[in-house]
């Protein structure tokens, strides 16, 4: 497997840095120092130093965000692994100060899984948030702090073999979400479970929804469906090396979803697509439009994750989450999106049963 270049790492990490709200000047300065040296070891060291500085200045959440970049894209060496542990510790410090956020640990058949939760009580719908193959759960603090305003219970966790999740990534990974719901219990899940699964986590959610009626809706950005698993050589080195790390180099072609698989997904699926996506080709979301019973998507003229449209992506996803929760604020967000006028084209399909 080809390792990603520093230039490619910088491009992908830029999206994660912007999504976490890190200071653009600090990020640009750090990237310039890393590139100038040309030493791959400078990557985790530079970001870890920034994290340590934030921690010393009493800003644990900001420190966590820099540590997340230090482990990027996965803990391939001791420094990155240490940064991953530092990210968890810094987040834990922050959430204890913040209040209202709990740590949950699950010993599941698939493996050990950790999660952060907020407002997770019987009677509340559950919003299960899972990042992609690079994203750790500590990146999703805004979902946790918004739990009460969303009037939902929020659980943020990680994909198999990402962060603290010890489950292997591969053909049986679609059991992870059902196993988490089993651990939560029927009463907690009774008001519905809405999955926000980014990128490859969106694929897991689609795969799980084929056979788990507890999943009420799926909201995703740039989720793969089929072709990506059959032609890994066409993917960027960051993606292929990360997938190889998570899967132990196993063949992932069996994870591709067929047309029959997609037809079995009977819950609403909401999808943000990027027209210039270097990971997810257009055909992936076209398959969803052709075969998923209730599918709505929006397109941005952007690369993977639509980093140039973060505000619109968040508004569009939030509007759809609120709509599934029966919250009238969804209408207001829809009007705001229309006024912004940046959502580009998209569509809505209703496949006959």
Predicted segments, located by residue:
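Short alpha-helix in the alpha/beta-hydrolase fold that links the catalytic acid
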Residues: 143, 267, 280-290, 301
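Hydrolase active-site cap/lid region
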Residues: 204-253, 267
């Amino acid at each position: 497997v080809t390792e990603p270049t520093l230039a490619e790492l910088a491009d992908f990490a830029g999206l994660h840095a912007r999504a976490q709200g890190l200071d653009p000047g600090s990020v640009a300065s750090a990237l310039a120092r890393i590139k100038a040296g040309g030493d791959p070891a400078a990557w985790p060291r530079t970001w870890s130093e920034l994290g340590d500085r934030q921690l010393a200045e009493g800003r644990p959440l900001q420190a966590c965000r820099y540590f997340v970049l230090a482990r990027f894209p996965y803990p391939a060496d001791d420094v990155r692994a240490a940064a991953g542990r530092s990210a968890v510790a810094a987040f834990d410090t922050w959430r204890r100060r913040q209040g209202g956020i709990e740590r949950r640990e699950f010993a599941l058949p698939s493996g050990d899984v950790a999660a952060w939760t907020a407002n997770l009580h019987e009677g509340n719908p559950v919003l299960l948030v899972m990042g992609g193959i690079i994203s750790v759960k500590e990146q999703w603090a805004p979902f946790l702090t918004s739990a009460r305003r969303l009037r939902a219970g929020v659980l943020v966790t990680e994909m198999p073999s990402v962060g603290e999740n010890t489950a292997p990534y591969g053909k049986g990974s679609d059991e992870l979400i059902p196993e988490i719901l089993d651990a939560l219990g029927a009463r907690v899940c009774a008001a519905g479970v809405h999955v926000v699964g980014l990128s490859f986590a969106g694929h897991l959610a689609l795969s799980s929804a084929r056979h788990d009626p507890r999943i009420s809706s799926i909201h995703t950005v740039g989720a793969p469906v089929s072709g990506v698993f059959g032609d890994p050589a066409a993917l960027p080195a960051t993606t292929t090396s990360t997938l190889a790390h998570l899967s132990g180099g196993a063949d992932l072609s069996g994870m591709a979803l067929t047309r029959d698989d997609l037809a079995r997904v009977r819950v609403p699926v909401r999808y943000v697509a990027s027209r210039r996506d270097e990971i997810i080709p257009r055909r992936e979301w076209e398959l969803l439009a052709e075969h998923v019973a209730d599918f709505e998507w929006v397109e941005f003229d952007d690369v993977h994750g639509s980093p140039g449209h973060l505000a619109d992506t968040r508004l569009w996803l939030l509007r759809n989450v609120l709509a599934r929760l029966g919250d009238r604020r969804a209408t207001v967000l829809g009007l705001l999106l229309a006024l912004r006028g940046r959502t580009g084209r998209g569509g809505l399909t209703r496949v006959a049963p």
